[in-house]
Amino acid sequence: MAKKRTFFSFFLISALLCLLVVPNSVMASEKPAHLTVASYTQFLKAQSDKSSLYEFSKLSRQQKQKVVQSLKDPSLLKMDIEETSGTVEAASTAAYGARTASPLFKTAAYTASCKAAGFTTTKLTVYVDYYTKNSSVTSVKSVRGVVTKNVNPLVSISKKSSKSWVQNNRAYGRIDWQWKIAAKNAGIKRQTAYGTASGASGGSTATVN
């Protein structure tokens, strides 16, 4: 009887562990061909930020299928619409003293988003921190890249390299992002942000290879 109780206890513990582990790892071994609307919905439910789940739930069945197809197919992923926005903000209130001759510290941010059927799947932001004096950009302090959103379970994004420079009175910061789809290389996306002394900003995104 003791052996039977031990075996039953071991089985019960194993079953409980499976219930705890599966929801968080269901997409980790997911192959592109196996990704479905149902499994993707479960993936979104496991995310800490529920905004993507809410947006996805509002889509029609056809739109959901289009999103999932886009996530599975690398060729469709490259065709996703990219929306961008750029902003410049002062790092401190002292930066608002535009009439002074002291150097001012500013940050330009440029965000690129990939969408499928109106649903945002990835969002990458590049920040360039720089100094200005009067109407001139004097130097770049640093460049940073942040994956602010990635709800494609088949895609991993990492920073491959970075570069910063000053040209034509603009501060530039560039990040090369390495994309992988289902653990296979899917090319490099180069994202550049720039800022000026007057507060103008912008950027660009291009596929390197």
Whereabouts are the PLM-identified features?
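N-terminal prepro-regions of secreted/extracellular proteins
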Residues: 1-116
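Mature secreted bioactive peptide module from preproproteins
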Residues: 89-209
